[in-house]
C-alpha cells in the first residue's frame, strides 16, 4: 500500500479526526508554557512587535516593517492587533496568533501527508510529531513574535497547497518573502520538484509559475508604495528616520559568505553544533537557550537515535529510488520538504560563513519540517515489515527525546512556577514612581511593553522607537538610568538592577542618506539577561 496514490486509500473520517485531535493537543501542550507564562521566553525583539500592534490599534502609527528596519514585514503585529482589541495587551495575547499558526502548520502537514503521500492518518502522525513536539529550544522560537520564525514553515505549507492556484501561491510567496526571506527556499524547492515530476515542463505549468511570480511582484510593489507612508521608527516617523536602509533582497544578498574556505567548517558545525541543539539531542540547560527554567533538554547518546532515524530513512529512500527509477506523485511533497530543508541548511552555512551557534538557531528552523518530509518519504516507499517497524520505533524514540523535556518544563511551571524577574523590574520601577528612564536595548522595550507604556524606557545603544528618546529627554528632570551593575551614585533595586542618576544622552544625529551612515548593530544579549 505504500506509495499508492491517496485516491486509492479511503481512510475513515473517524481516523482523520482522531489523528488531528491528537496532533493538535500535543502542539497545544508543548506551547502552553511559552504562550501563557510571560517569563518563559520573552525579550525586547518580541516586545517591539507587541508595541507595533499596540500603536496600530491606538491609531498612533502605521507600522509596516519591524520598527527600525526596512525589511521583516510586521505580519505578527497585524495578527496580534485584533487579539489586543478583544483580550487586552499582554505577552500571551501577542503570542496567541503564533499558537494558531503552529496548530495550522501541524494540520496542513498531517492532511497533506494523507492526501498527497497516501499515508494513513495514524501513520502520518509520526512524521508530523517532529514538528508538533520539537525540542524546547525550537518550540520557544516557533512561538516568539520577533520577525518570523515559524512563518517560513507556514509559507512552505501554503505555497505547496496553492501551487495549482498561482495567484494565491504568488501572494503567499510575496508576503512570505517580505516577512522572512527564507520563504525563497520553498519557491526554489517547488520549482525543482515541478521540473522533476513534470508540471514545469509543460506550457500550462510554465504559465502557472509566471502568474505566481507576477502576483508576487505585484505584492512587492504595493508594499514598496505603502512603505513611504509607514511609521518606520515608531509613532510620528517615516523611513527617513532610519540611519540605515535595506530590504529583503538586500538582506539575502548580504548573507553570502565570500570565503569558500569556511564552507567545510560550516558543514562540520551543522552536524556537531546546529543539529544537536535543533533536534534536542545535546544535553543543555534551558536557561542557556534563553528559556527561564531550571530544566534541561537533551540526553547523552541521543544523537545516535537521531543519526539512525535519519540515516536509515535516507538509505531507504535512496535504495528505493535507485531500484524503481520512476517518480511517483506520492514522492513530490516529501521531496519538496526535504529540498526546503537542504536549501535552508546551505543558506545557513553560507550566510553565517561557517560560524553556527545556538544564538542564531532561528535562522535555520526549516530542517524540522525537512525531517518530517524525509520520514514520510521513507514510510511511503517502505512496505510493512521488520525494517519499517524498527525504524518507527527509532522515530518514536526520537520524539521521546524532545517530548520528555517538554513535559518536564510544563510540570515545572505548573508545580513551581519560576520567578518572573522581568515583571519584578516593572514592579520595582513602579513602586519608586519611575516613569522615564534610559536603558540598554534588551531591557528598554521589554520593560516598556510589560508596563503597557506606563513606564517609558528609551534604548541608549540601539534605537527602534525614536519617540521614546524624545519623551525621556523631555522629562530629564525625573528620568533615571537603569543598569545591570554598579553605577556611581546609583542604588541597587534588586539583583541585576541598579537605579542610576540621569546622564544626558547625545542628541540623535540627523538622518543620513540611505546607506551612508549605518546605525549600530543590536548589541549582544548579556548572558542570562533579564
What is each model feature region?
Residues 19-24, 121, 125, 171, ...:
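Signature aromatic-anchored transmembrane alpha helix within multi-pass, membrane-resident enzymes
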Residues 154, 179, 185-186, 298-309, ...:
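Hydrophobic/aromatic-rich transmembrane helices and adjacent perimembrane loops
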Residues 207-305:
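Membrane-lumen/periplasm interface segments of specific transmembrane helices
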